[in-house]
Amino acid sequence: MKYIIEHMEEGFSEWVILEYSQILREVGAENLILSSLPESTTEKDIPQRLLKLGLRWTTKDLKGINEDFKDLELLKDGRVCLLDPRATIDLQPEDATKFDYFVFGGILGDHPPRDRTKELKTAYPNLLISRRLGDKQMTTDTAIRTTQLIIKDRIAFEDIKFIDYPEFRFNKNEATEMPFRYVLDKEGKPILPEGMLDLIKKDSAQSLDDLLM
């Protein structure tokens, strides 16, 4: 099971670095590809924290990934799943046998959401098949975590425990509500990337848009 994140933007915010780092730790560097980086991108543009975790990246788009990564199975029409908030069918455990790759357009962590999935579906009408992860916005690491639970662990979406729009309180007068859905851990707490809570606390005076950029 391979995951592809269509980065499609310049630079890496601290938020994105923490998310990608967590994804790499959870799925393994061999199972994650960052694609569609700006053509001018060189290795020095990639954060060292991600390189040390083994991040594999390319400026190629979905159709060109196999040119840079000969070890990967070919991306075949109808065997690539696009996680699309506007899809009509939710991802199910039985989809594990239907898809080789799962593509995330960066749209799941945007607030407000940008319709990047529409761009991808237009660009690759035969390659991609859309599936949904419920009707709430997720961060990219949450979306990949949810996909793993469904596809790898064979847990139905409706059986996964989530929390929507959790509030993180730092003191009596200071709290931040996150406008996303998160998976809950065994203790009933939302799963965040390592260091994310500190970042939210540090930047709680900023707007969420500033934090994500």
Swiss-Prot record:
Pfam families named among the record's database cross-references: SFM1-like
E.C. designation(s): 2.1.1.-
Signal peptide range: none
UniProt KW Transmembrane helix keyword: no
GO biological process: methylation
Major location category of this protein: cytoplasm
InterPro entries linked to this entry: SFM1-like
Described purpose of this protein according to its UniProt entry: S-adenosyl-L-methionine-dependent protein-arginine N-methyltransferase that monomethylates ribosomal protein S3 (RPS3) at 'Arg-146'.
Family, as annotated: Belongs to the class IV-like SAM-binding methyltransferase superfamily. Protein arginine N-methyltransferase SFM1 family.
Miscellaneous comment: Present with 2520 molecules/cell in log phase SD medium.
Record protein name field: Protein arginine N-methyltransferase SFM1
